[in-house]
Amino acid sequence: MRTASALAFTLLLLGTSLAGCAGLGGGDDGKDSDQSLEVPLWEVGDWWLYTFSTPDYSDDTARLVVASDTEEDGSAYMLAISSETEARRHAVLNHNPFLGRMTKDNLSAFENGIAQPVLTFPLAIGEVWSFSLFSNDWSATVLDISGNLVVISAQSSDGASLNYVYDEAVGFFSSFIWTDADGSENLRMMLAAGGEAHTGEVFFVRGGDLYSNVWDNSDPDAEFRDTFLVSDHPSSGEWTEMIYFLDASCGSGASTISLTLRDHTSISALARVWGPGAEELGTLGTIPYPSEEYTLTLTFTGNTNLRLKIAGGITESWTL
C-alpha cells in the first residue's frame, strides 16, 4: 500500500497536470486505473510546446517536433525543434534530455549513446524499472493512473527525484520535474500545447560541452586566463560551430569586464567589453568552424559577475 505522502504527491501532480493540459485533449476518458497503457505511435509532424524552467537561466519555450521516424534503422524517431536559435540554446544549456533520437518501443531518450527508458511500456500501476539520466541512476515507479494521466516518480541514491506525468491523450509528458535532495528544482518542464502536422523547417543541434565557468569578482583588479581544446564529436566528427551562452553584469562606479577568446593562431574569435552598470543576460552566439586550442583572457574591475558556457555544435535540419 502506498504511503500517505506518496498519495498526496500523486494528487498534487494530477491536479497540476490537469490544470496545465486544459484544451489539449487530456482528462478522464473512463479508463480503469488497473488497465495498462501502451506506447503511442508518433507521426512525422507531431509537436509539443514546452516551457523549460531552471534555477540558473531564464525560462524558455520550445516546440518539439517529430522530424523523422526512420532513425536507428527504423527503430527510433528524431525529435527536433522548430527554431534553430532554440535548438542551439538547448545544445549549449543541455537541460532538455528529450531531443534527438527517441526509441519507438519505450520513447527512450539517449544519454551517452545509450537508450534510457524514462518510460517503459505498457505502463501499469506498481511497475518498477531503472534508468540513467542527468549522469545519475534512477529507480522509477508508476504511482497512479487516472484517465489518460500516468503519475511516475523516480528516486536516486543521493536523494534527488524525478516526478513526471505521462499524458496518453497527447502521447508525451504533461510535466517533468527534477528536484535535488534539498528540495531545489533543477528543471521544470511543462506542456503548454500539442498538435499534429507541423510544417516548415525543424532543427536538431548535436552538442558537446567544451567549456563552462562562472566568475564573481569584488577585487579592484583581477585577470584570468584559461585554455581549452576543441576535440571532435565522438561519433559525428568535426564541429561545424561553437555555440556560446553568457550572462554578464557590472556594478556601479568603475566596474568593468573585458573578454577575449583567441584561436591557436591568435586570431580573435570573440571579444566583448562591459562598462559600469552594464548588464547582459542570456546572450547566445556562434563561432564557425572551431579547431584545436583556444585561449580565454578575462579582466575584471570592481563588482562584476560573468557566466560563460561554450559547446560544440553540428546542426541537422528537416523540411516538413
Go through each PLM region and give its residues.
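Extended extracellular/luminal ectodomain segments enriched in beta-structured repeat modules
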Residues: H233-I243, S291-E293
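Edge beta-strands of jelly-roll/beta-sandwich modules across compartments, strongly enriched
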Residues: S255-I257, G302-T319
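Acidic, serine/threonine-rich low-complexity disordered tracts
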Residues: D29-R88, N106-S108, N112-P117, F121-D216, ...
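Beta-sandwich interaction modules
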Residues: A271-S291
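Short, surface-exposed beta-strand/strand-loop-strand elements in extracellular ectodomains
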Residues: S252-V273
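Bacterial Sec-type N-terminal signal peptides, specifically the leucine/valine-rich hydrophobic h-region
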Residues: G15-L18
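Noncatalytic modules at the cell exterior or secretory-pathway interfaces
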Residues: G285-N305
